[in-house]
C-alpha cells in the first residue's frame, strides 16, 4: 500500500551542482613576518595605574561640601589655576606675541625679549637652586658634618682613659655583662618564637614569575600589568605564602609588598571549592586607613580582571553605605578588604556574618596596627578568626618584638626582612633646611613652593587644623592645593587624591593619614613641614616618592627641637643621599612680609567658612527633625547598633592613641621653656661615661641597702605581733549579746573575766580581798510592777 501523506505540498525540483568543479581563488604563500610577536597582554600593555577616578564611585553621598577655593577666589578676585594651566597660558601668550612681532627689527625683538624676561615669573629662572646659595653662615653649611662628628665624639668618650680603681672597673664590666645577657635572652626568645627562613640560604631564588609555578591566568595578568620580574620581597615571600606559612615581611617603601601577598592569595583561590557549599569569606586584608584599603582593592581587582579569575571582593571601610556593604556580605565574597572599625561593626550588627571559614589573614602596615588605638580592635578581630588560619604581616618598618607579636597567635612565623639596614629607597635624595625660629617656618615653605617646587608635591603637617589653614594661605598666594585629613568626608578625601593624581592640583596638604601605603605615580617631592616624632613615621613619609626604582627627593624643615630626629634620619641614610638646602634669607623675609599682609584675609576666610558650616548644620538639624516626625515609627523600629566596648572604653582607647601620637613630638614653645627651667642641670651632666656609671651603681647599692633594712624591720614587726600576750595582761574574749541595748545591736561585746582581775590598773573592775567595797543590793529590783500577770484572772 502506498504511503499517503496528508496536508503536504510537493516541492519544486532543486538544482544541485554537487560534483561540478568550482573555480577557487589562488592563494599566494606569504612569507613569515620576522618582526611578529605574540601579544601576551591581550592588547593591554599598560601598567597598573591607581587613583584613576573610579574610586569615588559608591561613596555615600551627602550635602555638597563647602569649597574653600570659591571663598578664596571671591577674596582674590581671580581664579586659582594649576601650574600646568599657568604654563600653557604663558606659552600661548608667548606664541601670539611672536606672531605679531615677526616683521619687527632685531633691536626691537631683543628689547622685547629682555622685557619679557624681566616681567615673567621668576620661577623659570630659579628652578634649579644651588645648594650653596644664600646668606647662610658657616654653622648652617656644616650642619650635617657637625652631627656626624657628634657620633664620633660619643665613641671617643667611651674609649677615653681615666684614673679609676679596680672596684669601679668591675662595676662597669658587670653592667656590660648584664646588658649582654639581656640581649642574649631576647635573641633566645626570638629563636624559639620564629622559624628559620629557608630562602636566605637558597641560591636558586626565582628570577621570574614563571619559575614560581603560578597558574597561567595569573601569569597573564602579571604580564599585562607589566610585572616583568619579581622584586626581592616578592621573590622570597610568594613561595613561602604558597606553602601556607606565617610571614613577617619587611622591605623598603615602593618595593611591591601589596603584590607580594595578593598574588599568592589569588593563586590559592584558583583551587578553592566551587561546589554548592563552597562559597565563603576566605581572605581578610586589614588596613589602617580607608585610602590604603581602597588601593589594595584596586590592585586585587586589576589582577583578577586581567587574568579572568572568578574572584569577588568586598570593601568594608567607613564612609561607604552600611546597607550596601551588608548586602554584599550576604553573597559571601572571597576576599574582604577592611578597616578594623567597620569590620567589627559588621561582625557585631550584620546577621549571619562570621569569619569562621577564614583561611588567610593579612595585616598591612602591621607595625601601625599594633600601636595604641588599634590594639583593642585588633584583639577582637583575632578572637573572631579561626586558629588554623595563615597570617601574613607586612610593613616597611616591621617590628620583630615577641611581646607585641604574641598577641596575634602566630604559628612559627618566618621573618622575611629584605635589606633590614636600609629603610629608604635608593633613588631618594634627602634634603634638610634649618629653621632658626618657628615664625620663619611658613615663609620658608612658601618660598620653596614659589621658587623651586611647583607641582607634584605632598606636604605633611602634624595637625588637621594647620593643614587646612595652610591650604587657605596657598590659595591666597595663587597656589592650587588640596587637603587630605580626617576632618573631611570620604568623598572629599578620595576626590583630593584623584585631583592630585590628574594634575588638577599641584600640592597635597596632608597629615600622617596619607603617609602609609599610598602609591601615587608622579610624586616628585615630599616636604615635611615639621619633623615627625618617630623615625618610622619619617621613613613612611619620605617613602611616598622614589617608588618602584624612580627618583625623588624629600625636603624637611628642621628646627632646634627636631635635632634628635634629624640626627637619627642622617644616621640611617647613606652619605650620598643627604643634602643641606639653604633658602635665601631675602626670599624668606619677602614671604614673611606678604604673609603678614594676608593675616586679616585668612581670619575672614576662616570666619566665613565657619558661618557657612553653622548654617548647613542648622539646615541638617531641621531636616533631621522633619524626618523624625514623618518616619518616627520606621526609625524607632530599627535595631540599635552595638559595639564590643562601652562608650568610656572606646573614648579611652581613642585618647590613648592620640596621646601616644602627640607625645612622640618634641615639646616646643612655652612648655619646653618650663621644662628647661625645672631641669637646668641634671645630676649626671658633665660626667664622663665611666664616672656616670660608677655614681649610678653607688646609688643603686644605697637603694638596695635601704630596701633590705626596710624589709628586715618589717619582718621583726611581724614576728613581734605573732608572739602570744603575757599572762599578766587581760585576755579578751567574746560574749554573746545580752539584754537591753546590747540585744538591740545584736553584736557580741568583748569582756574580760567575770569579776575582773586584781592586777587591773585602770580600776574599772571590781576589786578582791580586804579592799573590796560593800555591794549594795536592791531588794525591790526583782518585784514585778503593775500590769496583769500571766495567771491573773
From Swiss-Prot:
Where does this protein have compositionally biased stretches of type Basic residues? 75-89, 741-752, 782-793
Q: Where in the cell is it found?
A: Nucleus, Nucleolus
Region entry Disordered: which residue ranges? 1-208, 645-793
- List the biased-composition ranges (Low complexity): 193-208
Q: Single GO molecular-function term? A: ATP hydrolysis activity
The protein's matches in Pfam families, at most eight in alphabetical order, are given as: DEAD, Helicase_C
Q: Which domain of life is it from?
A: Eukaryota
- List membrane-spanning regions: none
User: What is the purpose of this protein?
Assistant: ATP-binding RNA helicase involved in ribosome assembly.
The written remark on domains in the entry is: The Q motif is unique to and characteristic of the DEAD box family of RNA helicases and controls ATP binding and hydrolysis.
- Name the chain's protein: ATP-dependent RNA helicase DRS1
Organism of origin is Cryptococcus neoformans var. neoformans serotype D (strain JEC21 / ATCC MYA-565) (Filobasidiella neoformans)
Amino acid at each position: 500500500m502506498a504511503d499517503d501523506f496528508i496536508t503536504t505540498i510537493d516541492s519544486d525540483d532543486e538544482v544541485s551542482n554537487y560534483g561540478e568543479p568550482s573555480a577557487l581563488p589562488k592563494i599566494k604563500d606569504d612569507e613569515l613576518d620576522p618582526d611578529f610577536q605574540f601579544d601576551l597582554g591581550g592588547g593591554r600593555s599598560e601598567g597598573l595605574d591607581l587613583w584613576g577616578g573610579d574610586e569615588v564611585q559608591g561613596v555615600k553621598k551627602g550635602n555638597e561640601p563647602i569649597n574653600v577655593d570659591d571663598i578664596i577666589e571671591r577674596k582674590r578676585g581671580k581664579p586659582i589655576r594649576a601650574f600646568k594651566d599657568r604654563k600653557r597660558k604663558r606659552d600661548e601668550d608667548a606664541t601670539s606675541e611672536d606672531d605679531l612681532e615677526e616683521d619687527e627689527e632685531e633691536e626691537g625683538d631683543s628689547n622685547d625679549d629682555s622685557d619679557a624676561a624681566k616681567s615673567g615669573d621668576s620661577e623659570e629662572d630659579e628652578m634649579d637652586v644651588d645648594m650653596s646659595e644664600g646668606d647662610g653662615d658657616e654653622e648652617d653649611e656644616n650642619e650635617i658634618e657637625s652631627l656626624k662628628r657628634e657620633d664620633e665624639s660619643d665613641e671617643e668618650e667611651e674609649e677615653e682613659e681615666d684614673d679609676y680603681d679596680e672596684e669601679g672597673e668591675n662595676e662597669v664590666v658587670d653592667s656590660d655583662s648584664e646588658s649582654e645577657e639581656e640581649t642574649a635572652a631576647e635573641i633566645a626568645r626570638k629563636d624559639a618564637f620564629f622559624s628559620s627562613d629557608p630562602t636566605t640560604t637558597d641560591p636558586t631564588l626565582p628570577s621570574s614569575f614563571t619559575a614560581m609555578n603560578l597558574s597561567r591566568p595569573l601569569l597573564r595578568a602579571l604580564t599585562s600589568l607589566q610585572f616583568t620580574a619579581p622584586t626581592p620581597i616578592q621573590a622570597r615571600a610568594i613561595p613561602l605564602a604558597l606553602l601556607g606559612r606565617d610571614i613577617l615581611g619587611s622591605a623598603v617603601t615602593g618595593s611591591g609588598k601589596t603584590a607580594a601577598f595578593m598574588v599568592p592569595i589569588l593563586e590559592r583561590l584558583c583551587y578553592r571549592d566551587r561546589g554548592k557549599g563552597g562559597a565563603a569569606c576566605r581572605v581578610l586584608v586589614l588596613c589602617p586607613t580607608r585610602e590604603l584599603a581602597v588601593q589594595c582593592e584596586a590592585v586585587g581587582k586589576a589582577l583578577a580582571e586581567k587574568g579572568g579569575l572568578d574572584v569577588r571582593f568586598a570593601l568594608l571601610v567607613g564612609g561607604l553605605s552600611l546597607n550596601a556593604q551588608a548586602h554584599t556580605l550576604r553573597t559571601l565574597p572571597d576576599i574582604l578588604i577592611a578597616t578594623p572599625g567597620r569590620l567589627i561593626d559588621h561582625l557585631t550588627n550584620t546577621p549571619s556574618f562570621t569569619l569562621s571559614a577564614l583561611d588567610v589573614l593579612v595585616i598591612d602596615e602591621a607595625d601601625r596596627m599594633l600601636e595604641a588605638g588599634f590594639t583593642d580592635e585588633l584583639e577582637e578581630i583575632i578572637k573572631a578568626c579561626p586558629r588554623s588560619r595563615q597570617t601574613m604581616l607586612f610593613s616597611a618598618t616591621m617590628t620583630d618584638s615577641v611581646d607585641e607579636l604574641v598577641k596575634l597567635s602566630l604559628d612559627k612565623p618566618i621573618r622575611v626582612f629584605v635589606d633590614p639596614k636600609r629603610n629608604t629607597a635608593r633613588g631618594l635624595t634627602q634634603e634638610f633646611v634649618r629653621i632658626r625660629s618657628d615664625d620663619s617656618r611658613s615663609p620658608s615653605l612658601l618660598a620653596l613652593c614659589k621658587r623651586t617646587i611647583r607641582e607634584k608635591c605632598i606636604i605633611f603637617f602634624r595637625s588637621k587644623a594647620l593643614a587646612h589653614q595652610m591650604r587657605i594661605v596657598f590659595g591666597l598666594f595663587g597656589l592650587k592645593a588640596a587637603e587630605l585629613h580626617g576632618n573631611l568626608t570620604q568623598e572629599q578625601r578620595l576626590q583630593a587624591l584623584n585631583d592630585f593624581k590628574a594634575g588638577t592640583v599641584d600640592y597635597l596638604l596632608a597629615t600622617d593619614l596619607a603617609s602609609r601605603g599610598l602609591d601615587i605615580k608622579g610624586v616628585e617631592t615630599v616636604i615635611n613641614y615639621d619633623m615627625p616624632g618617630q623615625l618610622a613615621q619619617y621613613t613612611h613619609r619620605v617613602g611616598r616618592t622614589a617608588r618602584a626604582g624612580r627618583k625623588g627627593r624629600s625636603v624637611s624643615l628642621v628646627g632646634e627641637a627636631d635635632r634628635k630626629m634629624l640626627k637619627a634620619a642622617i644616621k640611617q641614610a647613606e652619605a650620598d643621599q643627604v643634602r643641606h638646602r639653604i633658602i635665601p634669607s631675602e626670599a624668606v623675609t619677602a614671604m614673611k612680609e606678604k604673609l603678614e599682609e594676608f593675616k586679616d584675609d585668612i581670619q575672614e576666610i576662616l570666619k566665613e567658612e565657619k558661618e557657612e558650616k553653622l548654617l548647613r548644620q542648622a539646615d541638617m538639624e531641621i531636616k533631621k527633625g522633619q524626618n523624625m516626625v514623618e518616619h518616627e515609627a520606621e526609625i524607632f523600629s530599627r535595631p540599635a547598633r552595638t559595639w564590643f566596648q562601652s562608650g568610656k572604653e572606646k573614648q579611652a582607647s581613642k585618647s590613648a592613641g592620640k596621646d601616644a601620637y602627640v607625645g612622640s613630638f618634641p615639646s616646643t614653645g612655652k612648655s619646653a621653656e618650663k621644662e628647661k627651667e625645672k631641669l637646668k642641670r641634671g645630676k649626671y651632666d658633665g660626667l664622663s661615661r665611666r664616672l656616670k656609671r660608677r655614681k649610678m651603681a653607688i646609688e643603686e647599692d644605697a637603694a638596695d641597702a635601704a630596701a633590705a633594712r626596710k624589709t628586715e624591720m618589717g619582718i621583726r614587726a611581724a614576728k613581734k605581733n605573732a608572739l602570744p600576750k603575757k599572762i599578766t595582761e587581760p585576755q579578751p574574749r567574746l560574749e554573746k549579746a545580752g539584754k537591753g541595748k546590747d540585744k538591740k545591736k545584736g553584736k557580741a561585746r568583748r569582756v574580760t573575766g567575770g569579776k575582773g582581775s586584781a592586777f587591773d590598773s585602770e580600776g574599772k573592775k571590781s576589786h578582791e580581798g580586804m579592799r573590796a567595797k560593800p555591794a549594795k543590793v536592791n531588794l525591790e529590783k526583782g518585784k514585778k510592777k503593775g500590769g496583769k500577770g500571766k495567771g491573773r484572772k
